[in-house]
Amino acid sequence: MTETIKKSGRGVNECKRCGRKQGLVRKYDIYLCRHCFREIAHEMGFEKYS
């Protein structure tokens, strides 16, 4: 059985850090899931205002 590679849709991209496919932050070509983004956003220069 051959493995097919998905070429379009929501499951194409994955988190660079953990490989998760849900909750992906793609803005500014970050490609991190929301969990990883919250952990390292401050190190990347993002600030929380409220």
Curated annotation (Swiss-Prot):
This protein's UniProt keywords: Metal-binding, Ribonucleoprotein, Ribosomal protein, RNA-binding, rRNA-binding, Zinc
MF annotations from Gene Ontology: rRNA binding; structural constituent of ribosome; zinc ion binding
Entry superkingdom: Archaea
GO cellular component: cytosolic small ribosomal subunit
Assembly information from the UniProt record: Part of the 30S ribosomal subunit.
Protein family per UniProt: Belongs to the universal ribosomal protein uS14 family. Zinc-binding uS14 subfamily.
This protein's name: Small ribosomal subunit protein uS14
Provenance organism: Methanosarcina acetivorans (strain ATCC 35395 / DSM 2834 / JCM 12185 / C2A)
Upper lineage: Archaea, Methanobacteriati, Methanobacteriota, Stenosarchaea group, Methanomicrobia
The gene coding this protein: rps14
